[in-house]
UniProtKB/Swiss-Prot annotation:
It comes from Mus musculus. Interacts with the cytoplasmic domain of the autophosphorylated insulin receptor, through the SH2 domain. Interacts with GRB14 (via BPS domain); this interaction protects the tyrosines in the activation loop on INSR from dephosphorylation. Binds to the ankyrin repeat region of TNKS2 via its N-terminus. Interacts with activated NRAS. Interacts (via SH2 domain) with TEK/TIE2 (tyrosine phosphorylated). Adapter protein which modulates coupling of cell surface receptor kinases with specific signaling pathways. Binds to, and suppresses signals from, the activated insulin receptor (INSR). Potent inhibitor of insulin-stimulated MAPK3 phosphorylation. Plays a critical role regulating PDPK1 membrane translocation in response to insulin stimulation and serves as an adapter protein to recruit PDPK1 to activated insulin receptor, thus promoting PKB/AKT1 phosphorylation and transduction of the insulin signal. Residues 1-20 are annotated as: Disordered. It holds the Pfam family SH2. Residues 104-190 form the Ras-associating domain. The modification N-acetylthreonine is found at residue 2. This is Growth factor receptor-bound protein 14. Belongs to the GRB7/10/14 family. The keyword 4Fe-4S does not apply. It comes from the Eukaryota. Disulfide bonds: none annotated. One of its GO terms (molecular function) is receptor tyrosine kinase binding. GO terms for cellular component: endosome membrane; plasma membrane.
Length: 538
């Protein structure tokens, strides 16, 4: 180390020796060379005074001692010598000392049914499921695994479910700059319903299974066939297709296979020479048409569309139209399973796995939604007891609800409120409007659209004002993928006003009692009321 420093200084001295012999002599004195001349004998220094000569010698001695002191200090030992010589140094350093979080963030805006919105700054690799969970926690909603993000393309009237494993930031990257597109958050009860009741979504006249599945087919067997990577059932039926670049529609017989969607050029023949490829699915998504008749001139309101992922114009759309809602649901569900079947099944079975934005603790729901974790309790006696009989538990729950409302009415009556029918109806109206399933003044068509958007599975319902009969109500519900409407008739008994669905055989003092009764009992309805349609703010 000392030698290299001296060599460097000697080299520097030699480089400047041609121009300045004085610099060479001073450098030798500073380095303590034995052959250095006396400063008095060096040309150019003979004019220095003795005082100046002594000062120069002292400065040179101090410089010499300082250099020697620096050179003699031992180097600081390296506490991790193996990291300096290891070929894996960079890998270990990156693992042991990670850099600051470099995940890119992006702002996305999510809308609700009432058009309120919330802007979120999220990592670019966050999934749609994580975005739903963040909004659920922020708004203190109960997570029942039905909350869903929807991609809404306003300018062409299309909408689709953003699957739980998809990245919303990628969805936004496919939008055009000037397009008025939105992400909506709402419930979709039909999102994974086909895993529970596959035959409900795939009617026998539209599905052809392999020969080995002839005979009785259990839901488990049907599900295994749809999730199989080697075979896939053939979906077939008539559809209306919009001709490319034209406004006209043409009816043809279509076949859905693993290789794509085909139509027959000769009736219902499925011979290879008669089949022509209509679209494949590797670079496209399936959308529901919201206003097919108005925007695209569709012959029926049950339209859907195959749209490429890239931003494009209406010419890139593959517009289709079914004869009924059940047929459209079958086609759309089959295409979803064909594209992401096993991934959708994993999303359904393990909704809280694979989070990218937060850990499992911060993303856990604030309230448990598992019915198995709740027990019915009876506190009427001196000691509380668990009610084991389910029938008794339901009856106790109904009785407590009725008693609560009765006490509330008595409190209102004691304060001089409702003896008059008009005052009583005003109180009931205030109670009804506080319920999430009550939608007040919406039309029949709007009620149908709302139920379809939130998944037309059996038992999805809402209550609204009747447009044809003032001061009465209508129960709108879905069953068999059809929307049905039931008039809630007001009846009077002993001067009191009641509500009924069965001509007075079962009477209720308000709509809350009516809804709770039919949530527990089928009665005159085709099925029990299971899921209510609500417009939640984000």
């Amino acid at each position: 180390m000392t030698t290299s420093l001296q060599d460097g200084q000697s080299a520097a001295g030699r480089a400047g020796a041609q121009d300045s012999p004085l610099a060479v002599q001073v450098c030798r004195v500073a380095q303590g060379k034995g052959d250095a001349q006396d400063p008095a004998q060096v040309p150019g220094l003979h004019a220095l005074s003795p005082a100046s000569d002594a000062t120069l010698r002292g400065a040179i001695d101090r410089r010499k001692m300082k250099d020697l002191d620096v050179l003699e200090k031992p180097p600081i030992p390296n506490p991790f010598p193996e990291l300096c010589c290891s070929p894996l140094t960079s890998v270990l350093s990156a693992g042991l000392f990670p850099r600051a979080n470099s995940r890119k963030k992006q702002v996305i805006k999510v809308y609700s049914e009432d058009e309120t919105s919330r802007a979120l700054e999220v990592p670019s690799d966050i999934t749609a499921r994580d975005v739903c969970q963040l909004l659920i926690l922020k708004n203190h909603y109960v997570d029942d695994n039905s909350w869903t993000l929807f991609e809404h393309l306003s300018h062409i009237g299309l909408e689709r479910t953003v699957e739980d494993h998809e990245l919303p930031t990628e969805v936004l990257s496919h939008w055009g700059v000037e397009e008025d597109n939105k992400l909506y958050l709402r419930k979709n009860y039909a999102k994974y319903e086909f895993f529970k009741n596959p035959m409900y979504f795939f009617p026998e006249h539209m599905v052809s299974f392999a020969a080995e599945m002839n005979g009785d087919r259990s839901p488990t067997q049907i599900l295994q066939v749809f999730l199989s990577s080697s075979t896939y059932p053939e979906i077939h039926g008539f559809l209306h297709a919009k001709e490319q670049g034209k406004k006209s529609w043409k009816k043809a017989y279509f076949f859905l296979r693993r290789s794509g969607l085909y139509f027959s050029t000769k009736g219902t023949s499925k011979e290879p020479r008669h089949l022509q490829l209509f679209s494949e699915f590797s670079t496209s998504h399936v959308y529901m048409s919201l206003a097919g008749k108005k925007k695209h001139g569709a012959p029926t309101p049950y339209g859907f569309c195959l749209k490429p992922n890239k931003a494009g114009g209406p010419r890139d759309l593959k517009m289709l139209c079914a004869e009924e809602e059940q047929s459209r649901t079958c086609w759309v569900t089959a295409i979803r399973l064909l594209k992401d079947g096993m991934q959708l099944y994993q999303n359904y079975m393990h909704p809280y796995q694979g989070r990218s934005a937060c850990n499992s603790q911060s993303m856990s729901p604030m309230r448990s939604v598992s019915e198995n974790s709740l027990v019915a309790m009876d506190f009427s006696g001196e000691k509380s007891r668990v009610i084991d009989n389910p029938t008794e538990a339901l009856s106790v729950a109904v009785e407590e609800g009725l008693a609560w409302r009765k006490k509330g009415c008595l409190r209102l009556g004691n304060h001089g409120s409702p003896s008059a029918p008009s005052q009583s109806s005003a109180v009931n109206m205030a109670l009804h409007r506080s319920q999430p399933w009550f939608h007040h003044r919406i039309s029949r068509d709007e009620a149908q659209r709302l139920i379809i958007r939130q998944g037309p599975v059996d038992g999805v319902f809402l209550v609204r004002d009747s447009q044809s009969n003032p001061r009465t109500f209508v129960l709108s519900m879905s069953h068999g993928q059809k929307i049905k409407h039931y008039q809630i008739i007001p009846v009077e008994d002993d001067g009191e006003l009641f509500h009924t669905l069965d001509d007075g055989h079962t009477k209720f003092t308000d709509l809350i009692q009516l809804v709770e009764f039919y949530q527990l009992n089928r009665g005159v309805l085709p099925c029990k009321l299971k899921h209510y349609c609500a417009r939640m703010a984000v």
